[in-house]
Swiss-Prot record:
Organism domain of life: Bacteria
Organism: Phocaeicola vulgatus (strain ATCC 8482 / DSM 1447 / JCM 5826 / CCUG 4940 / NBRC 14291 / NCTC 11154)
Protein name, as recorded: Riboflavin biosynthesis protein RibBA
Keyword Nucleotide-binding tagged: yes
GO cellular component annotations of the record: cytosol
Bound cofactor: record note: Binds 2 divalent metal cations per subunit. Magnesium or manganese.
Catalytic activity line of the entry: D-ribulose 5-phosphate = (2S)-2-hydroxy-3-oxobutyl phosphate + formate + H(+); GTP + 4 H2O = 2,5-diamino-6-hydroxy-4-(5-phosphoribosylamino)-pyrimidine + formate + 2 phosphate + 3 H(+)
Residue segments, region GTP cyclohydrolase II: 205-404
Length: 404
């Protein structure tokens, strides 16, 4: 990416503030696509026309979750099964001053109205021709997507947190990717940035966690150091368990482990969580250096109460993924941004990651951390967790090799 001469985030913010387009590209391990984005409050009919003529994707309008609630815009579907969980709301058109909602004038007016604090639910007709999107709170530090990048750019520019975006297609109808996006940006006179760089910019500007006091912690697996961290946004407390002297830039063995009270504490055989945690500590002790980041994200981020509801559904025949979806959650709602900042805080920027989960790798790499090796951490299945592990392999892409 460096060879393609991406623009700086500061340059892009300045243009975005003036109402100019910016091209944003995401990670190769995600969509690896470029989106044309512009501030919602600044958009003109001519810009809508440019997007339709040159980008040719789907016209969307990212707004905050709180704004969606204010405007009474529910999710487009109750169960989101799209590949990346794209959070569409019902489609809308601005009613007053518009006709069918299709014209460039009408669509620009609708997008501007989404960014108008005086707009109410009655401002819009449903369905319409603009696709609002729910943007996750905390922006790209929560979800490394174009939707969140739009909201972050608006906030960094001092504008209302709403934008318009459209995916950029090549002439042959395939998705435009680097280096073609660089050529397009040069041809159109636009700034080109990456979500990875936007994440790095925010991580330098903001602190997500408060670091606690470090203590020694002898365990049955070896002697470690423990540092607690408090997440500023919600008060959740996380833990870093460290072995040895970690030097910045040195690839060390790392396990990012989400809390599982049933498995980690009570030894539940319905999952492999506790065994993975204990095995990770043993491996790090044997290595003589490394860290476990223990995140307070029970049930893949849905909490203990919801996890128990999911367990009950599983007892009635659904699998772990279906259970989450039936309860209105995504299959995996974990936030790796806070884990990435904890790792940076203890000096880890390169790691040999203990995981079977490809999403975890992508999640951490999206925050500028380098994973030099994936180290498997497989557990022998038992009769209680056999189906759970098979679901993780078949439906969540986990790298598991048991034959059950």
């Amino acid at each position: 990416m460096e060879e393609l001469k991406l623009n700086t985030i500061e340059e892009a913010i300045a243009d975005f503030r003036e109402g100019k387009f910016v091209i944003v590209v995401d990670d190769e391990d995600r969509e690896n696509e470029g989106d044309l984005i512009v501030a919602a409050e600044k958009i003109t009919p001519e810009q809508v026309n440019f997007m339709l003529k040159h980008a040719r994707g789907v016209l969307c309008a990212p707004i905050t979750i709180s704004r969606c609630k204010e405007l009474e815009l529910p999710h487009q579907v109750d169960t989101n099964t799209s590949v990346l969980g794209t959070p569409f709301t019902v489609t809308v058109d601005k009613l007053e001053g518009c006709s069918t909602g299709v014209s460039i004038h009408d669509r620009a007016a609708t997008i501007r109205a989404l960014a108008d604090p005086t707009s109410t639910p009655e401002t819009f007709g449903r369905p319409g021709h603009v696709n609002p999107l729910y943007a996750q709170d905390k922006g790209v530090l929560r979800r490394a997507g174009h939707t969140e990048a739009c909201i972050d750019m608006a906030r960094l520019a001092g504008l209302y947190p709403a934008a318009a975006l459209m995916e950029i297609m090549s002439e042959d109808g395939t998705m435009a990717r680097l280096p073609e996006l660089r050529k397009m940006a040069d041809e159109w006179g636009l700034k080109l940035i990456s979500i990875r760089d936007l994440i790095a910019y925010r991580l330098k500007q903001e602190s997500l966690v408060e670091k606690g006091v470090e203590v020694d912690m002898p365990t049955e697996y070896g002697h470690f150091r423990l540092i607690p961290f408090r997440q500023k946004s919600n008060g959740l407390e996380h833990i870093a368990i460290i072995k040895g002297d970690i030097k910045e830039g040195e690839p060390v063995l790392v396990r990012v482990h989400s809390s599982c009270a049933t498995g980690d504490i009570f030894g539940s055989m319905r999952c492999d969580c506790g065994e993975q945690l204990h095995k990770a500590l043993q491996m790090i002790e044997k290595e003589g250096k490394g860290a476990v980041v223990y995140l307070n994200q029970e049930g893949r981020g849905i909490g203990l109460m919801e996890k128990m509801k999911a367990y009950k559904l599983q007892e009635n025949g659904v699998d772990t993924v279906e259970a989450n979806i039936l309860l209105g959650h995504q299959a995996d709602e974990r936030d790796y941004g806070v884990g990435a900042q904890i790792l940076r805080s203890i000096g880890v920027t390169q790691m040999r990651l203990l995981t079977n989960n490809p999403v975890k790798r992508v999640g951490l790499e999206s925050y500028g951390l380098s994973i030099v090796e994936n180290v498997p951490i497989e557990i022998t299945p038992n009769k209680y967790n056999e189906r759970y592990l098979k679901t993780k392999k078949d439906r969540m892409g986990h790298t598991l090799h048991f034959n059950k």
